[in-house]
UniProtKB/Swiss-Prot annotation:
Matching HAMAP family: UPF0122 (MF_00245)
Family: Belongs to the UPF0122 family.
Chain segments annotated as transmembrane: none
Role noted for this protein: Might take part in the signal recognition particle (SRP) pathway. This is inferred from the conservation of its genetic proximity to ftsY/ffh. May be a regulatory protein.
Organism from which the protein derives: Clostridium perfringens (strain ATCC 13124 / DSM 756 / JCM 1290 / NCIMB 6125 / NCTC 8237 / Type A)
Protein name per Swiss-Prot or TrEMBL: UPF0122 protein CPF_1968
Listed Gene3D superfamilies: Winged helix-like DNA-binding domain superfamily/Winged helix DNA-binding domain
Pfam families the record matches: UPF0122
InterPro entries per the UniProt record, alphabetical: RNA_pol_sigma_r3/r4-like, UPF0122, UPF0122_fam_protein, WH-like_DNA-bd_sf
Amino acid sequence: MENRFEISMLIDYYGTLLTEKQFNVMTLYYNEDLSLAEIAEINKTSRQAIYDLIKRCCKQLHSYDEKLKLSKKIDKRYRIKEELMAELNKNSNLDEDIKKYIDEKLEEIINA
């Protein structure tokens, strides 16, 4: 299957666009690390049906991301945050508590 971390992130971003069954299967496979056989048993279906559903969902999630570009936007925000924090640490005599506060606020902006 595809990069587990990448798909897990796409599930976080676009999981609400999947059906409940699709979301549950994808979560079990990518986030809970259950095998195809275990998921098939839970859903009372075949291993092949679960495999096919996962492949379809991966394509669907990638399609959403190609159109909405949410993962690229979030990656860019994290890069900007890292650049800002590097500059703060390099050029500033700010107190560590203030740096931590700024870091937390930047994280809130990214996740808003």
